[in-house]
């Protein structure tokens, strides 16, 4: 029997990134991790054993815009039903004392059916991918999700704000960095102004890569442009950009850089905030979560056509104030749930 089962959504790399931060904080021996896709490679690169059980549907992104969202919603629903079957077998075999899920609602559904204590980690309290007929289906799915959130022992949201009922707002959750910035820059050979371009765990960021390369060619500042292309982009780009591919220590690279340019995923934004690195975050158009994330910090999709000016402006600014890392609070809340269960 394993005491904690941790299910991490394999859609993108953001969930795996913050989940690794939490798992490192817990240092709990009787814990197993389940995910899929590029998240598995990420966990393995960071010497964390994780079981590859999920194959999520892919977003169809053309020129930076999300297409066929209704089709994706239908594929997600089928994926969710399949994940319930998979997680049900695992949970029945392992008989855990606690289930933690980072936006893997299939495992939470099974946990709540089996009356197993459960914690949800999530950025969102509802989805808004579709309108019309698709919106009606999505509304029903949101209602089901809301019931799960209400029934969870705790819901951890990595944002600042007040706690209410079972919702714990921890602030951004990122990995801790022990080295100082100068040490990391020296190890990475960051000798001049360095821009890091990161597009996560999917191929949705190719449009942003191409636009950034063209913008950097035109700026009047001598810079290095470093690409973190992730595991799914094999296309070759300009020789003016150094592609590090898929790395295990993106958090350190962001901390060491002078500017991070990225899609508007929550985890990369949070790393920028906690490490004090100025950022430019371009959302996938029609991707409600990324558009909401970007809007909160003053960006929109159309900014992709003004990258040159934004890059020059950001590179002349001082580094930002470093916000507090919420991983300690998240760890304490999880341990509190475990101790309460053990004392029952």
Which residues does each PLM region occupy?
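Conserved nucleotide-sugar phosphate-binding/catalytic loop shared by glycosyltransferases and other
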Residues: 9-10, 29-80
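C-terminal alpha-helical cap of glycosyltransferases
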Residues: 309-312, 323-344
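A short, glycine/small-residue-rich beta-strand->loop->alpha-helix junction that serves as a flexible
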Residues: 8-20, 203-207
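Conserved nucleotide-sugar donor-binding subdomain of glycosyltransferases
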Residues: 66-98, 105-106
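A nucleotide-sugar donor-handling region in carbohydrate enzymes
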Residues: 130, 135-203, 231
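Donor-nucleotide binding loops and adjacent catalytic segments primarily
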Residues: 23, 181-256
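Short amphipathic alpha-helix
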Residues: 15-26, 38-40
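A donor-sugar binding/catalytic signature common to diverse glycosyltransferases
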Residues: 99-103, 120, 249-292
